[in-house]
Regions:
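Membrane-water interface segments at the C-terminal ends of transmembrane alpha-helices
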Residues: 22-29, 59, 70, 134-163, ...
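Hydrophobic alpha-helical transmembrane segments of membrane transport/permease proteins
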Residues: 15-66, 159-178
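Alpha-helical transmembrane segments of integral membrane proteins
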Residues: 2-4, 91-128, 144, 171-312
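Hydrophobic alpha-helical transmembrane segments of multi-pass integral membrane proteins
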Residues: 17-22, 61, 103-107, 150-151, ...
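Hydrophobic aliphatic residues
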Residues: 26-30, 38, 42, 72-73, ...
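An internal, D/E-rich "acidic patch" concept
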Residues: 58-114
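Residue-level recognition of pore/gate-forming positions within transmembrane alpha-helices
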Residues: 12, 20, 42, 110, ...
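N-terminal signal-anchor/signal peptide hydrophobic helix marking the start
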Residues: 6-16
């Protein structure tokens, strides 16, 4: 397994270089001259030239690319154009609030979806199964903005069960006070598509020969579903969970914006509004690297869950 991990990490290098080159091209050739963006409409040529020198964009492209690569390797992306704050510090300080929301959400979403998927698979084709799928379809058709507005107005404003907005320096207060309503909203939004997907995974396994063999041997339906079917359905479930994990690192854009949560999602929106390229580039590289690492972790988890999986 160690040899496989080393080989995969080595293979990530050219992929990451391709991502870095693509980001560099997009922001330097397609994104326009940052000096004009920072200087504004009332600038003169001398101001534009001074800004170019400060940013280093007056140098040849290969020099700029090398500077960008060094920034990635040292995790030092310079300062934000809009606030002057260190970009690395922005990422580190905004990551905590996003993870406070999204780690509990991922755990709850996965566990609840698996339980309900097994339950509806046990009564597949019944009225209950059709009703659950219909509710999932309705839930998926409603915009997250509707959920945010309704839940915020009814549960926070009218009933005062949750704070409307806010965030503090206390992790406990954030988790058990300010995060509850945002997590509830995101759970309601995400549970419908996840449940439908996991149900399809379970039903694919229910139709396999080993299930019919287990039934013929007199194994109970609940044991077949909870042990045999779940074990084999866990591979695509792990794939789904791992593919969604990079989203943990960019936060929930709308939720963080509406609830005033200082996470990475809200920071991305602010950076885009202000054309803060250093912040956007850093987060883009950061997500690309995280995606490749999570894919590697998923492959290793496959081996742990099912020893029959061969890592090649």
């Amino acid at each position: 397994m160690l040899a496989y991990v080393i080989r995969r990490l080595w293979q990530m290098i050219p992929t990451m270089l391709g991502v870095v080159l693509l980001i560099f091209i997009l922001f330097n050739w397609v994104g326009g001259d940052p000096a004009y963006i920072l200087a504004g409409k009332m600038s003169n040529p001398e101001q534009i030239e001074n800004i170019r020198k400060q940013l280093g964009v007056d140098q040849p492209y290969y020099v700029q690319l090398w500077i960008f690569i060094k920034q990635i390797l040292t995790f030092d992306y310079g300062a934000s154009w809009s606030t002057g704050e260190s970009v690395s510090q922005i990422i580190l300080t905004r990551l905590g609030p996003s993870l406070t929301l999204l780690i509990p959400l991922t755990i709850l979403q996965t566990v609840i979806s698996i339980i309900f998927a097994l339950a509806v698979a046990a009564v597949r084709g019944s009225l209950t199964d059709r009703m659950v799928m219909m509710l999932c379809t309705i839930g998926m058709s409603i915009s997250i903005l509707v959920y945010i507005i309704v839940f915020q107005y009814v549960l926070a404003y009218q009933l005062s069960w949750f704070p409307v907005q806010g965030w503090s320096d206390s992790f406990t207060e954030n988790l058990f006070k300010f995060s509850l309503l945002p997590i509830l909203i995101m759970l309601v939004v995400s549970i419908a598509p996840t449940l439908r997907l996991y149900r399809s995974f379970v039903l694919d396994e229910v139709n396999q020969d080993y299930v019919r063999t287990a039934r013929a041997k007199g194994v109970g339906e609940s044991r077949i579903l909870s042990v045999h079917v779940l074990r084999n359905a866990s591979i695509p479930i792990i794939t789904d969970v791992m593919s969604n994990l990079p989203a943990l690192l960019i936060g929930a854009f709308l939720i963080e914006r509406f609830f005033g949560i200082p996470g990475i999602g809200r920071e991305v929106i602010i950076a885009v509004e202000r054309s803060d390229f250093p912040v956007i580039k850093a987060i883009t590289v950061y997500i690309a690297a995280a995606t490749m690492i999570f894919n590697l972790i998923a492959d290793l988890v496959y081996k742990v869950v099912d020893p029959r999986v061969q890592l090649k």
